[in-house]
Amino acid sequence: MDEVPSSDGSKSACSGEVVMEQSVHELEEVFKKFDANGDGKISGSELADILRSLGSDVGEAEVKAMMEEADADGDGYVSLQEFVDLNNKGASVKDLKNAFKVFDRDCNGSISAAELCHTLESVGEPCTIEESKNIIHNVDKNGDGLISVEEFQTMMTSEMTDKSK
């Protein structure tokens, strides 16, 4: 685990923004395929049709459950924004877990100050152990001096939320 994978999202904010823009564009293209009548929203029947055309034997109850999960505003349709949000929610959890693995060099399920500092230095961010300890202190909910997967996810998602404001 000495290399930092290029697709883990742990690069600079600028490269992450480019990846996000590309994936939103790709999701728009997929959305257009689901939106058979071009009205800017996906209905339950459009979802069922596309899933069946892809070989999935989905029943009405499954389609209804999928629609309920995706339809955040409860209008009975999935808008482009709801579609993007749904897809990014699943991807971001996976991406965050992959990013966590990059930092968790000894694979023990937590990130120490030394691991944090080493990983930051490996991507060109100057760092001291003291700085790493301060970062950890700010997100360490249970006070063990380490960052758990949950604490890492909280830290990263609150950073993303702060940057979008």
From Swiss-Prot:
This protein's name: Polcalcin Jun o 2
UniProt binding sites for Ca(2+) 1: D35, N37, D39, K41, E46
InterPro entries listed in its UniProt record: EF-hand-dom_pair, EF_Hand_1_Ca_BS, EF_hand_dom, EF_hand_pair_protein_CML-like
SMART domains xref list: EFh
UniProt entry keywords in alphabetical sequence: Allergen, Calcium, Metal-binding, Repeat
UniProt-annotated binding residues for Ca(2+) 2: D71, D73, D75, Y77, E82
Binding site for Ca(2+) 4: D140, N142, D144, E151
Superkingdom, taxonomy of origin: Eukaryota
